[in-house]
C-alpha cells in the first residue's frame, strides 16, 4: 500500500512539472564551455544567430522553459502566470546579455538559495531524476534564444 502511494505521489509530481532535457536519451552531450566573468557569461554559448521568437516560445511554454510558473510578463498568450519571481517586463533594461545568460545557465551561482533551476549547468545538482542526470534543460542555442528574447523586454511594468 505504501509503495502504491509513493508511486502515485511521484507520478503526480512528475506530471506537474518535470523539466524535459534538451536532448533525447542516447544523443551526444554537446554542451559548450563557458567562462564566468563577474556576474555574467559574456560570450554566447553558440555561434548561431539567436531566434527571438523561439526564445519567446520557450519562455511561455509550460512543458519546456516553465518560466511562467514563477514569472509573469508581457505575454498575453501565457495564461496563469506566476508571482513567485520577478516580472520579466523590463528584463532587457535591468540586466545585460551576459547577466541574463548567467541567470539561465546557473542562477544558483549568483544566489545559492534560489529556486530557479539551472537550465544549462548539469554538475552538482540535487533531486534530478536518473533519466535527466547530466543533461541540460535547455541546449546552448535555446539558452541564446531565450537571452535574445529577454533582451527585447525593455519596458517596465
Each predicted region: which residue ranges?
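Bacterial N-terminal signal peptides that target proteins for export
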Residues: 1-9
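Electrostatic cytochrome c docking/interface patches
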Residues: 28-62, 157
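C-terminal segment of classical bacterial N-terminal signal peptides
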Residues: 15-23
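C-terminal capping alpha-helices of c-type cytochrome domains
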Residues: 101-103, 119-157
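Short pre-active-site segment immediately N-terminal to redox-active cysteine/selenocysteine motifs
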Residues: 62-66, 74, 142
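Sec-exported extracytoplasmic/periplasmic mature domains
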Residues: 60, 93, 105-109, 148-155
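Extracytoplasmic/secreted proteins, especially bacterial periplasmic and envelope-associated proteins
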Residues: 50, 54-57, 87, 95, ...
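Gly/Gly-Pro-rich "capping" loops immediately C-terminal to redox-active cysteine motifs
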Residues: 49, 68, 72-106, 115-129
Amino acid at each position: 500500500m505504501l509503495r502504491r502511494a509513493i508511486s502515485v505521489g511521484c507520478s503526480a509530481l512528475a506530471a506537474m512539472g518535470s523539466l524535459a532535457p534538451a536532448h533525447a536519451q542516447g544523443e551526444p552531450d554537446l554542451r559548450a564551455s563557458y567562462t564566468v566573468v563577474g556576474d555574467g557569461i559574456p560570450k554566447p554559448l553558440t555561434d548561431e544567430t539567436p531566434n527571438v521568437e523561439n526564445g519567446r516560445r520557450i519562455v511561455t511554454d509550460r512543458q519546456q522553459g516553465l518560466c511562467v510558473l514563477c514569472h509573469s510578463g508581457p505575454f498575453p498568450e501565457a495564461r496563469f502566470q506566476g508571482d513567485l519571481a520577478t516580472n520579466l517586463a523590463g528584463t532587457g533594461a535591468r540586466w545585460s546579455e551576459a547577466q541574463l545568460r548567467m541567470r539561465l545557465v546557473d542562477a544558483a551561482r549568483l544566489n545559492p538559495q534560489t529556486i530557479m533551476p539551472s537550465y544549462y549547468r548539469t554538475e552538482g545538482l540535487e533531486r534530478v531524476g536518473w533519466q535527466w542526470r547530466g543533461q541540460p534543460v535547455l541546449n546552448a542555442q535555446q539558452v541564446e534564444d531565450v537571452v535574445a528574447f529577454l533582451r527585447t523586454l525593455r519596458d517596465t511594468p
